[in-house]
From Swiss-Prot:
Keywords: Acetylation, Cytoplasm, Host-virus interaction, Initiation factor, Isopeptide bond, Metal-binding, Phosphoprotein, Protein biosynthesis, Ubl conjugation, Zinc, Zinc-finger. This is Eukaryotic translation initiation factor 2 subunit 2. Residues 13-22 have a biased composition (Basic residues). The modification N-acetylserine is found at S2. Residues 106-118, 139-149 have a biased composition (Acidic residues). Residues 40-51, 96-105 have a biased composition (Basic and acidic residues). It comes from Homo sapiens. GO terms for cellular component: cytoplasm; cytosol; eukaryotic translation initiation factor 2 complex; synapse. There is a cross-link at K102 (Glycyl lysine isopeptide (Lys-Gly) (interchain with G-Cter in SUMO2)). Residues 1-119, 139-164 are annotated as: Disordered. A zinc finger (C4-type) spans 281-305.
Length: 333
C-alpha cells in the first residue's frame, strides 16, 4: 500500500495479543486461573507511541514496493535478447579474398583429396548399374579381330575374290599404274630369284560360311579351297576340326558341315594358320610346295628353292565326352 491510501485515524489503537492464563493446582486439587487468583487487574492505558508505529509501517511498505519494482525490472531485462550487430559485406574485399585463395591453391599441391572428400561428403550410396553381358558372337568377333591384326602384320596371306586384273569384267580402261603392277607381278612369277629380299603375298579366296539351322555351320567352298592349296581334303578337314574343337563331315554336295556356330572370320584365321604351317615354304615363303608323308612324319618340300623340312603332326584339342559318359551311366543304372 502507498502512503496516499493510508488515512490517519486517532481513535485506532494497536491490538495486543492475549496472554495465556496458566492454571495452578491447589492443595485440594482444584484448578485456579489468574482470574480466580486474587490479583489486582491492571487497566490498559493507551500508549503514546502510536504515531511512531504508523510511520514505521508506512516505511516498510514503501521499501517492499520498491524492491518488488526492482525485481520486476530485473526479470524483464533478463528476458530481453541482445541484438546482434550486422556486419557489412563488401564485394570488393570478397573478390580479393577469392583471388588470394586461388593463388594459394595453385601454389600448394593437394594432398590426399579423396580422403577429404569422403570425410566431408560421407559415404554416399552408389546407384546399381545394370551390367549387360555381351553375347558369345560379339566376344569371338573382338578376339578374332585382334588376332587378324596381329597375323596380318606377320604373314603375307590375304583373302580376296579377284583372280585376274582389276579391270577384268568391267568396261572401264586400265590405268598406267595397274599395267605397271601387272608387269612386275609377271616378272616375279617368272623369276623368283629377282625378289629375294621382298615378302611374297599369298592371295586366297575367302571361305563361304552359311548357317544351317541353329546349331550347325556349312563351309560351302571347302573343296575349291583344297584344290587351290593342292592339299588333300582329309588333311585340311582334320586340321579344321582340331582347331575348332568340334566334329563335322562332308555331305553329298561336297560341303563341310560343322557342328556349332562359327563365323567367316574364325574360319579365315584357321585357314591362315594352315597355310602358314603346311602350305608356304618356311625359307622362301613360296606357295609352290608338296606335302609328303614319310615314316609317320609329314615333310614339306619346296619346288622353287628345293628345301625340305618336317611339319608338326595334327593333334586334336580337348573335347568333352558327354555322350559316352551318358551311355556308361545309363548302362550302369
Amino acid at each position: 500500500m502507498s502512503g496516499d491510501e493510508m488515512i490517519f485515524d486517532p481513535t485506532m489503537s494497536k491490538k495486543k495479543k492475549k496472554k495465556k492464563k496458566p492454571f495452578m493446582l491447589d492443595e485440594e486439587g482444584d484448578t485456579q486461573t489468574e482470574e480466580t487468583q486474587p490479583s489486582e487487574t491492571k487497566e490498559v492505558e493507551p500508549e503514546p507511541t502510536e504515531d511512531k508505529d504508523l510511520e514505521a509501517d508506512e516505511e516498510d511498505t514503501r521499501k517492499k514496493d520498491a524492491s518488488d519494482d526492482l525485481d520486476d525490472l530485473n526479470f524483464f531485462n533478463q528476458k530481453k535478447k541482445k541484438k546482434k550487430t550486422k556486419k557489412i559485406f563488401d564485394i570488393d574485399e570478397a573478390e580479393e579474398g577469392v583471388k588470394d585463395l586461388k593463388i594459394e591453391s595453385d601454389v600448394q599441391e593437394p594432398t590426399e583429396p579423396e580422403d577429404d572428400l569422403d570425410i566431408m561428403l560421407g559415404n554416399k550410396k552408389k546407384k546399381k548399374k545394370n551390367v549387360k553381358f555381351p553375347d558369345e558372337d560379339e566376344i569371338l568377333e573382338k578376339d578374332e579381330a585382334l588376332e587378324d591384326e596381329d597375323n596380318k602384320k606377320d604373314d603375307g596371306i590375304s583373302f580376296s575374290n579377284q583372280t585376274g586384273p582389276a579391270w577384268a569384267g568391267s568396261e572401264r580402261d586400265y590405268t598406267y599404274e595397274e599395267l605397271l603392277n601387272r608387269v612386275f607381278n609377271i616378272m616375279r612369277e617368272k623369276n623368283p630369284d629377282m625378289v629375294a629380299g621382298e615378302k611374297r603375298k599369298f592371295v586366297m579366296k575367302p571361305p563361304q560360311v552359311v548357317r544351317v539351322g541353329t546349331k550347325k555351320t556349312s563351309f560351302v567352298n571347302f573343296t575349291d579351297i583344297c584344290k587351290l592349296l593342292h592339299r588333300q581334303p582329309k588333311h585340311l578337314l582334320a586340321f579344321l576340326l582340331a582347331e575348332l574343337g568340334t566334329s563335322g563331315s562332308i555331305d553329298g554336295n561336297n560341303q563341310l558341315v560343322i557342328k556349332g556356330r562359327f563365323q567367316q572370320k574364325q574360319i579365315e584365321n584357321v585357314l591362315r594358320r594352315y597355310i602358314k604351317e603346311y602350305v608356304t615354304c618356311h625359307t622362301c615363303r613360296s606357295p609352290d610346295t608338296i606335302l609328303q608323308k614319310d615314316t609317320r612324319l609329314y615333310f614339306l618340300q619346296c619346288e622353287t628353292c628345293h628345301s625340305r623340312c618336317s611339319v608338326a603332326s595334327i593333334k586334336t584339342g580337348f573335347q568333352a565326352v558327354t555322350g559316352k559318359r551318358a551311355q556308361l551311366r545309363a548302362k550302369a543304372n
